[in-house]
Amino acid sequence: SSDTPLMQQWRDAKSRHRDSLLFFRVGDFYELFHGDAEEGARLLGLTLTSRNNGAAAKVPLAGVPAKALDDYLSRLVKLGRRVAICDQVEDPALAKGLVKREVTETVTPGTVLADNLLSERRNNFLVALVGSPDGSHGLAKLDVSTGELSVQRVPEGELRAELGRLEPSEVLLPRALAESPEIAFAAPSTLPRTVRDDWMFEEDIAAAELLKAYSVQSLDGFGFQSHDDALIRAGGALIQYLAEIRPAGVTHLKAVQIRRPGRVMLLDEMTRRNLELIEPLRSGEEGGTLLEVLDGSVTPMGGRLLRRWILEPLVVAEEIWTRQEAVAECVASPELRDALRRALKGVSDLERLAGKIGTLRVGPRDLGSLRNSLESLPAVAEAAGNASSDLTQSLGTDLDCMKDVLELLASAVADDPPAALHDGGVIRTGWSQELDEIRAVRDGARDFIASLQARERERSGISSLKVGFNKVFGYYLEVTKANLDKVPDDFVRKQTLTNGERYFTPELKEWEEKVFGAEDRIGQLEVELFAGVRAQVAGAVPRLQDSGARIAALDVLSAFAHIAVRH
């Protein structure tokens, strides 16, 4: 090939992701080439230019700054597009020849994880469908952001209603089903569809994927029965697709739930619309839905659960009475109601924090948010545990406050951590003796450099001399034009300005190197220490998910009482 090595590397990655726009990391930018560049320029309003390609012709090029990637991904996902992220997977400074690059993630409407791509108060479902000889369908749904996975049989003629209730962001289909009349009728034309070969949906292959995902020898423990082959096929294909999307894997999948008929009422599209459960009868109108009237929840998990309860009303009398008893107690007891809601307001989105931990996307600020949330759990547990209704009491008594995780985060993470790890200042003083010692060296060197200003002013007789710093030139001594005749002989010119000159001295250079050397080591050490803390927290993800589910239920029950009293 006459392509440059970089373009050969791009072609290799693109050949495995033909159905995606390939964002290819080059330095501080993600670049798109050839047809991707032309489409990206059209969809995102990017400038279309070209890149030299050795002996081959120039290739179309468009690019976005790496730090702005999420903004551009958000726009593409909203348009229903798939994006493959090809990252540099080795330090360019250490690379021998071409920097190694790999596709680390594929972002699709049904598998997004970034906060700005998700709605706080609704699930983001990826759905897989398979057909059955009797006309029914096996359906699996997954919210990657929370780890919720469930499978169910959808009777013949009810697929449209079920997809309307779930409002998935993406549907995964076997090739044989993709063009069928029932899919054309049931799935809105605007719903992004991903089609894969039929073998991926075969029962043996799908069952093996489920066994591997949950590290079990048998699926019997989940409650699968002999006639559940369509459920297994849909669930296993969905797991396999997730592995394709996220090669690094996920560790936060909850146990697969098998949804059987009889516990909740399935509402068809006409019923949902006429009752204005979650959207008004006339599109474009605002307000007036049952969801808006009843939503007094104070946590994102509670908001999502309320939406589910409205769309899936219970039909089992005992469960209805249990919920009514819990709400009635909260209505009758302002002390219980207020104590619960006051404590719940301090809890952030535990379910999605668990998802970030399980997909290695958790940042310093996320762990700070988790720590602050865990501090509120004992008050929630105490208030609920003292209730007399069975449901509220059990939710509170069995609530895991995760004291060990709280102690870890309180000891390891700074009070106000930055959003990004590379910004520094993530690890709390006292967590690592080595880190504390290197920070002391850096701070001492900075203090010495700061003291240079007074000493150099006195030595040179230049009262306006300043010590400054910028990221391009490092530390410098700045002298105005009027004082250039007083500059000592050991000042070395560093930069010429309109109104003066910037210099360094051997002494300043020596101390600058101490600061930079310490900062480099601090950055490396914080990355290592943060990874260690994250790994410890990852071991508690199932507990975190269970606590999140309990918090959501307590939130909705107390919100019902709050709305009842208010109206």
Regions found by a protein language model. Give the residues of each.
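Long, charged, glycine-rich C-terminal linkers/tails
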Residues: 88, 250-259, 455-468, 562-567
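Intracellular alpha-helical coupling/juxtamembrane segments of multi-pass membrane proteins
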Residues: 320, 343, 347, 445, ...
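Cytosolic, long alpha-helical scaffolding segments
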Residues: 405, 412, 419, 475-491, ...
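Extended, charged coiled-coil "arm/hinge" scaffolds of SMC/Rad50-like chromosome-maintenance ATPases
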Residues: 497, 501-535, 551
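Charged catalytic and DNA/RNA-contacting regions of genome-maintenance
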Residues: 1-329, 338, 342-358, 362-454
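Conserved NTPase motor "head" modules and their coupling/switch loops across ABC/AAA+ ATPases, GTPases
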Residues: 1-2, 486, 490, 494, ...
